[in-house]
Swiss-Prot record:
InterPro entries: Class_I_gatase-like, GATASE, GMP_synth_C, GMP_synth_GATase, GMP_synthase, GMPS_ATP_PPase_dom, NAD/GMP_synthase, Rossmann-like_a/b/a_fold. This is GMP synthase [glutamine-hydrolyzing]. GO terms for cellular component: cytosol. Residues 203-395 form the GMPS ATP-PPase domain. Its EC number is 6.3.5.2. The gene is guaA. The keyword Repeat does not apply. Residues 9-202 form the Glutamine amidotransferase type-1 domain. It comes from Brucella abortus (strain S19). Keywords: ATP-binding, Glutamine amidotransferase, GMP biosynthesis, Ligase, Nucleotide-binding, Purine biosynthesis.
Amino acid sequence: MSTTAYPDTILIIDFGSQVTQLIARRVREANVYCEIVPFQSADEAFKRLQPKGVILSGSPHSTTDIGSPRAPQAIFDAGIPVLGICYGEQTMCAQLGGNVESGHDREFGRAFLDVQEDSPLFAGIWAKGTRHQVWMSHGDRVTSLPDGFTIIGTSPNAPYAVIADEKRKYYGVQFHPEVVHTPDGAKLLQNFVHRIVGVKPGWTMGAYREQAVEAIRKQVGSGKVICALSGGVDSSVAALLAHEAVGDQLTCILVDHGLMRKDEAQQVVEMFREHYNLPLILVDASDRFIGALEGESDPEKKRKTIGRLFIEVFEEEARKLGGADFLVQGTLYPDVIESVSFTGGPSVTIKSHHNVGGLPERMKMQLVEPLRELFKDEVRLLGKELGLPDSFIGRHPFPGPGLAIRCPGGVTREKLEILREADAIYLDEIRKAGLYDAIWQAFAVLLPVQTVGVMGDGRTYEFVCALRAVTSVDGMTADFYHYDMNFLGNAATRIINEVRGINRVVYDVTSKPPGTIEWE
């Protein structure tokens, strides 16, 4: 993305933390533009962006390891504010003459910070002498400070939990202010960008819309564009952005891969053809997808297969249209960060996403990904900016691979139909209970397990259905939704009574981490 319209930029240097993008999310909540760059290219990015302030991320590495990542010396020579988070604090100290050691007591999870001194970093949130909850995740710790630094906060296992050189406006925090488990963390980051860096709020979804449209036009030129429309919020917003940018150069293609929710394909076609006048082609490729997935139980192979087939179908449809040069996808930040570090940094791969991990290396179209830098809640705000109705914007996320990854084990048409019906009943019960908007994501999973049951006077041996519901802000962390047991009982009874093939229902109470939201 071009940053010419945003002279007040914060540069976030990524050392490989899985939650680096949450730092960006918190900065954007403060209506300040920021970019994440890997430490390997931070020198170039620093020169290009000329940021007003810099934030150094956490990392799975140890500062004491030979060859561990370092921040460019140029940022410390520039006279601008710097905030180091966890590893970022440690490398800042090490680079400026302090000391960091391994082997001390580690801190993982909730901890309590004692504020030792007042500071602009704490303004309006924490006062000297008070104690506050934070979230720690570190094995190393600072043991001596560089010249000019003082301790302004401590915790039981981190005597240098918050440090500051107020004159040079360098700050370090051993905890993670970017995660929701540090209740005041977002305000602390706002203090850094507004009070300390002095950047004024000016970056909004309206501004992003203009920037994205400009970027699409610049990338596409006069080329033909097709959009991978699924009917979800992400692809729909991407389609509307692309249509605003290039108009009739765009054709949307909806692939019915046989893995969508009940009646979803028809609902999407009606909405986009009738309400938004977008050129839309519906392709029934269900036989092709389900045939390729038949008997496949490995979740990574499922995702890769689905991604490969998507591209094959789009290329075929593009040829029917006389050729297309670009493919629009609704890829988001979390999609990419969980596949491989978006920034090229050393973060650990959790699982591939069909949008990024399944693409053939020799794809014949160039990708256009206007939402690649956004989180889910930002996409919803952008959708509202583009005029999408609240009822549509508030739909729960649905994965591109669809029901295939909610059907662990081998995929068959029969199992997909059973799952589709169970999922529809579950969501219907949620809506009738008025809970839909309180839940980030809810869905049914058909387990590759059969159990004995009794219905009437007969013995049954049928599948187990797992119900999943989570609360989340951005999809990076999540907690299971705490239903009333009567609700679960009613939902289970309906599913067992109305769906042939299921005789047992269970509820998933796993948070993220350690689990992921989806089962595969």
